[in-house]
């Protein structure tokens, strides 16, 4: 449910 994304920070899902 949570992945490391450089766009959202540390926890965010790309929808």
UniProtKB/Swiss-Prot annotation:
Signal peptide: none annotated. It is an enzyme of class 1 (oxidoreductase). Its cofactor is heme b; Ca(2+). It comes from the Eukaryota. The keyword RNA-binding does not apply. Its EC number is 1.11.1.7. One of its GO terms (biological process) is hydrogen peroxide catabolic process. One of its GO terms (cellular component) is extracellular region. This is Peroxidase 5. It comes from Capsicum annuum.
């Amino acid at each position: 449910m949570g992945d490391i994304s450089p766009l959202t920070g540390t926890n965010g899902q790309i929808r």
